[in-house]
Amino acid sequence: MGFFLFSQMPSFFLVSTLLLFLIISHSSHAQNSQQDYLDAHNTARADVGVEPLTWDNGVAAYAQNYVSQLAADCNLVHSHGQYGENLAQGSGDFMTAAKAVEMWVDEKQYYDHDSNTCAQGQVCGHYTQVVWRNSVRVGCARVKCNNGGYVVSCNYDPPGNVIGQSPY
């Protein structure tokens, strides 16, 4: 009986390892769903009293097409297309939907709503795009780059960050 259990250990280990891999792989994909992107955006928007975004498959297709072009070198270069756009990059499974949006929303600390400006030397345009009241549709995509990193793009319709206008 002891021999039988011992001889089954390698296959048990293999099955356990495969199961763990599937769980981790699934959770990684689950952290990048449409709902994950929407929840992260709409939490930030609710904090400033802005209506929630809705998911748009056409905008998401645009985002997917564009990040696919960035996969070769993972350089963040804006598309300058018809939509507002936020880009993020990171390594491994660290760069999830929620993490990308969190990075953009963290710029809130540099935004002064009263003067509608960013603190000197700081960036806050990603944050203002996330909460831009006139942007009502979003589509996002994530791609693994050839260097092993990830690029995330969220695109917004209509685009925000209109000069002279406040986001909310």
UniProtKB/Swiss-Prot annotation:
Name of the molecule in the record: Pathogenesis-related protein 1B
One Gene Ontology CC term in the entry: vacuole
Subcellular location per the Swiss-Prot or TrEMBL entry: Vacuole
Organism lineage string: Eukaryota, Viridiplantae, Streptophyta, Embryophyta, Tracheophyta
Pfam families: CAP
Modification note: Three disulfide bonds are present.
Function: Probably involved in the defense reaction of plants against pathogens.
Entry coiled-coil feature ranges: none
GO BP terms in the entry: defense response; sexual reproduction
First and last residue of the signal peptide: 1-30
Keywords linked to the UniProt accession: Disulfide bond, Pathogenesis-related protein, Plant defense, Signal, Vacuole
SUPFAM superfamilies assigned to the protein according to its UniProt record, in alphabetical order: PR-1-like (SSF55797)
Induction: Synthesized during pathogen infection or other stress-related responses.
UniProt superkingdom: Eukaryota
SCP domain span: 38-156
Organism for this UniProt entry: Nicotiana tabacum (Common tobacco)
Family: Belongs to the CRISP family.
